[in-house]
Amino acid sequence: MNRRFRFRRVANYINLSTPLGLLISIIGGAVRRPGPDGLILAFGYRYRFPIAGAFTVGNVVLTRQDSLGERLILHEGRHATQWAWCVGLPMLPLYLVSMLLSMIICGHQASYNIFERLADLDDGGYPRKPLWWRRSKGTG
């Protein structure tokens, strides 16, 4: 495994985000499998929240699906790196504030969310919505 992914894995265990992700996967009834680059893929998560095809807590990628596409895994891997850079749990309020700001300025939770943009909107399957004040009449 690449050194940067080993660092990310260790950092996310130390900052407790990966243990939190593992706990969420257990509570959510997900089946855990080793993934690429030190990720842990948790399939069959049973809860409807959060509303996303997949979400990442530490190095744990949780999904209700039974498989994930390569691009989505790359996207979620970038979120795992964000957890490490945010030193773990501070990622939660930072992400929520970023999501709220995106909703306010364009009406979509991901389009202007800095975390989703840095993880690549296209790889995550998110649209690129225009800002409210830049929309022409009749566009939505």
Specify the residue positions occupied by each region the protein language model found.
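Metalloprotease/metallohydrolase-associated module, dominated by Zn2+-dependent proteases
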Residues: 1-37, 41-45, 49-52, 87-140
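Short pre-active-site segment immediately N-terminal to the catalytic Zn-binding motif
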Residues: 48-73
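Generic hydrophobic alpha-helical membrane-span motif
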Residues: 65, 80-81, 85, 122
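Active-site recognition of the HExxH zinc-binding catalytic motif
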Residues: 71-83
